[in-house]
From Swiss-Prot:
UniProt key word DNA-binding: no
Enzyme class per UniProt: transferase
Protein name, UniProt field: 8-amino-7-oxononanoate synthase
Keywords: Biotin biosynthesis, Pyridoxal phosphate, Transferase
Sites bearing N6-(pyridoxal phosphate)lysine, chain numbering: 251
GO molecular function per UniProt: 8-amino-7-oxononanoate synthase activity; pyridoxal phosphate binding
Pathway the protein takes part in: Cofactor biosynthesis; biotin biosynthesis
Gene: bioF
Required cofactor(s): pyridoxal 5'-phosphate
Catalysed reaction, written as an equation: 6-carboxyhexanoyl-[ACP] + L-alanine + H(+) = (8S)-8-amino-7-oxononanoate + holo-[ACP] + CO2
Amino acid sequence: MKPGAPPIATPLLDTLQRGLAELDAQGLRRVRRTADTACDAHMRVDGRDIVGFASNDYLGLAAHPALVAAFAEGAQRYGSGSGGSHLLGGHSRAHARLEDELAGFAGGFSDAPRALYFSTGYMANLAAMTALTGKQATIFSDALNHASLIDGIRLSRANVQIYPHADMHALGALLDASDAPTKLIVSDTVFSMDGDLAPLAELVALAERHGAWLVVDDAHGFGVLGPQGRGALAAAALRSPNLVYVGTLGKAAGVAGAFVVAHETAIEWMIQRARSYIFTTAAPPAVAHAVSASLKVIGGDEGDARRAHLAALIERTRALLRATRWQPVDSHTAVQPLVIGSNDATLAAMRALDARGLWVPAIRPPTVPAGTSRLRISLSAAHSFDDLARLEAALIAASEASA
C-alpha cells in the first residue's frame, strides 16, 4: 500500500466482530482460564485457590512424581524436541518402545496387535477415519460421537450414515440396507458429555455379522475401565479381528498424545497413508518416555487403588446430584453431567460454584443440543470425599437459589 493511501476495507473483521457479539448475546462465548499450578484436584487458577472439577485427569496422574521424573529424564536423554516427522528423522527409541508397550497393554482384542502413537487424540481419529476408508466406503456413526471423529468422517470422502445415539436396531437396519464394499462402524466408548457407555458387545456382534470394521474411541475409558485399566474393550472381554481401538494419553494417563491399536496390517497402512501422522512433527520423545512410566502406574497396584477410589467417588457423586433441583444424567463413569437447560441459568450456576472456590465448567451449544446446557463435573482419583462435600453444599445452594 502506498504511503498516505486509505486503509483497505476489511469486511472479514467486521463479520467476525458481529459474530462475537452474537455469541455474547446468546451466552455462548467461551473463555479460557489460566492455571498457575500443575493440574490437580487442588489448584491455583487465575490467582485463586480452587478445587477443580474440570480436568480429565481421571486417575490424578498429571502431577504424579514418577511421571514428572520420567518426563525430566526423557528430556535429559532425548532433548526437548523430536526434530521432524516420524518418517523423516523424528521417530525415537522412546516412541518405538511406547508403541510396543501400548500394543501389549491395550491390544488384547487382536491376535496380531500393533500400535501407532500420535501427538493428539484429534489426529489419531482423523487418521483412522481417513486412512481406512475412502469414496467406496460407508461409515456408520453414532449421533453423539466426538467432534474429532465427525471431522475425520467429513475428510474421509466416504458415504456417511448417522444412527440415533446407541440405537442398535436402527444401526442394524442401516447395515442391512448397505451394499458398500467397505463398512466402518464408529462410536465413542464413553460419551464425553453424557458419560454413558456404548453397547460395545452389540456393536461388535453387528460388525461381525455384516463384515464391517468397528472403530471405537476410548478417550474417556482408557486407564479407568477394565482390568488394570486396559480400557472398555477389556472391560467387556471383547475380541475381534475387525476392531480398531483409539485411546488417549492426556486424560487418565496424565501426559499427552494418543494411539491407535489394530491388526498390524491396518497400522502399517496408516503409517503409509494417514496424513495426520505423516505430515506433522513427532511429539517430543520425553512425552513418550513419561507415558511409559504412566503405563506402569496404571497397570500396577497403585492404579488399582486409584480406580477403586474413583469408583467410590462416582457413586457418592451420583447420590449427591440427586439432591439438587436439576437433572443428573445416569452416568456410572467419571463424567457426571448435571443438565440445567438454558445457557444463562447454567452460566449462573457455574459462577455460583466459582464464588465458593469450585471450578465446574458450563457446557453449552454447539457442544450439546440447545436446551440441554449443563454443568460437567469431572471426577479424579485426586479428589477426596471432603471435596465432594463442598461440591454438594454448593450445588444444593445454587439449585435452590435458581428455583
